[in-house]
Amino acid sequence: MPKASEIKKGFAIESNGKTLLVKDIEVTTPGGRGGSKIYKMRCTDLATGARVEERYKSDDVVETVEMNKKAVSFSYVDGDDYIFMDNADYSQYVFKHADVEDDLLFINEDTQGIHVILVNGESVGLELPSSVELVIEETDPSIKGASASARTKPARLSTGLVVQVPEYIATGDRVIINTAERKYMSRA
């Protein structure tokens, strides 16, 4: 069984008899000598949908649950439901808007590399690719000769996500965004 320091976002863990899907991990290092790192995991209870916070020291052993992943593509929206289609057998996976709200900031009809996470045969979440290509919908005008400076400006992307981009980037440019850090990486 892995230690808490080896658990990543998207893992399914067993805690107090509940199966939890890890949505976010925050690492803190307490002051003082010899203090081990504390891993605060924000999770969703797969049975009830409730949000749960678990805390572990870096060397605590955490019980994981076996997961499967299937490659999917975003298909369409039906009211409050977001439908993703299996790339192999064309079966569909339905997610409520609230369940995938954060992930939707990185997904458009062209996004490749999305995986649905299955626990005990049931779809519980999405795994995004490490980076996605998106179009800048709105940003301040680019400044000629600004490539020499390291200043940034906010830009709203086609999915609604707002990131800081270099000053030379203009509206309509295609950019690559790191999904884990929510940061600009490069032009596409």
UniProtKB/Swiss-Prot annotation:
SUPFAM superfamilies the record matches: Nucleic acid-binding proteins, Translation proteins SH3-like domain
Family: Belongs to the elongation factor P family.
Record's GO cellular component terms: cytoplasm
GO terms of molecular function: translation elongation factor activity
Protein name: Elongation factor P-like protein
One Pfam family from the record: Elong-fact-P_C
PROSITE patterns: EFP (PS01275)
GO biological process: peptide biosynthetic process
